[in-house]
UniProtKB/Swiss-Prot annotation:
Protein name: UPF0358 protein SH1840
Family membership noted in the UniProt record: Belongs to the UPF0358 family.
Any matching Pfam family: DUF1507
Highest taxon of the lineage: Bacteria
Organism classification: Bacteria, Bacillati, Bacillota, Bacilli, Bacillales
């Protein structure tokens, strides 16, 4: 069982690193609100979010990550994305 626990920790840590990378993209955009609705940026962000969701789903299916933990990870990113859109509409 300890091996499974270690694998779960490694899997969750990797998901967190990927989430932090996406969070960094969001924060860079929030700091540089010159082109917040840039279609290219939105496409990259959507692709990254989709990819992370698939990673989370896969880790959950393998039993490496708890479904609720994966959901909370995605929720955290979605909240940051919401802040970006809110900041943009307040600047306009």
């Amino acid at each position: 069982m300890p091996k499974q626990s270690k694998m779960s920790n490694v899997a969750y840590e990797q998901l967190n690193q990927d989430a932090d990378r996406i969070l960094h993209l969001i924060k860079v955009q929030m700091d540089n609100l010159t082109l917040p609705s840039c279609p290219l940026y939105e496409e990259v962000l959507d692709t990254q979010m989709f990819g992370l969701q698939k990673e989370v789903d896969f880790a959950v299916k393998l039993g490496l990550v708890d479904k609720e933990d994966g959901k909370n990870l995605m929720l955290r990113l979605e909240k940051e994305l919401s802040k970006l859109h809110e900041a943009f509409t307040n600047v306009k």
